[in-house]
Amino acid sequence: MPIRVLDELPAVNFLREENVFVMTTSRAPGQEIRPLKVLILNLMPKKIETENQFLRLLSNSPLQVDIQLLRIDARESRNTPAEHLNNFYCNFDDICDQNFDGLIVTGAPLGLVEFNDVAYWPQIRQVLEWAKDHVTSTLFVCWAVQAALNILYGIPKQTRTDKLSGVYEHHILHPHALLTRGFDDSFLAPHSRYADFPAALIRDYTDLEILAETEEGDAYLFASKDKRIAFVTGHPEYDAHTLAGEYFRDVEAGLNPEVPYNYFPKNDPQNIPRATWRSHGNLLFTNWLNYYVYQITPYDLRHMNPTLD
């Protein structure tokens, strides 16, 4: 799907250089179809980098996707220019009366922070409750998975003693599930988290269906049977260099991090890493857009299927 964004968004030129199909709002009206409306709640500090990563994955199908970027943290950003936020992001009050086909909630570097200590925790709760009645399908990524499990299912925060960082092998549990359609039996995906997602915990305390696990038995991909919510505990959107950037940042901060697993060639941080998960990430987001959003969303968004309760 060509993603539809404002002409001036920096991602337009960045992604076009990669031959990603981006349609600006000035061109889009020439196609007489209703674009899918997808809201991205971007919780990552480096918002422009994160925009590029997610927009790349949303761009590779035949329908238009109308992207709206959302922020809920009113504090001044140290990593993203205020002008960018003011020009390209909306506040929740701007869209709370609208309906959307899809919502993506990104990760956030909050793995060691208690939920109630997160500055925008009340706003997270507000958005997730709102989404029940205003969004066809929501996709949670990494830390957002942990937050959603707490808000929607009452599951306490589960934290690892050491950070999981690297590129790990996974296997699918339901090869005929729509969200894993076309996946290889085993596939690679990056992780960068303190959050812990034991598969047994998901099975015991939710009615969610686990679709893929790590080799160590952690849940990687799971979803509700009605397709209204889906969860991915890793970072399939990451660029080839993202884990390297996090590793060297932590080295400079004196945190003595472990070298990300199965990432640098020959396990040597001086070697340039390669993305071995790109096809998986593209297929995951294409499947979500097609089977969890496009196939079940109403043509007229004024007539939503209400509530997950």
Swiss-Prot record:
One GO CC term, this protein: cytoplasm
Active-site positions on this chain: C142 (acyl-thioester intermediate), H235 (proton acceptor), E237
Binding site for substrate: K163, S192, R249
TM stretches of this protein: none
Location(s) in or outside the cell: Cytoplasm
Predominant location category: cytoplasm
Subunit structure: Homodimer.
Known role: Transfers a succinyl group from succinyl-CoA to L-homoserine, forming succinyl-L-homoserine.
Name this polypeptide is given: Homoserine O-succinyltransferase
Organism expressing this protein natively: Salmonella gallinarum (strain 287/91 / NCTC 13346)
Gene that encodes the chain: metAS
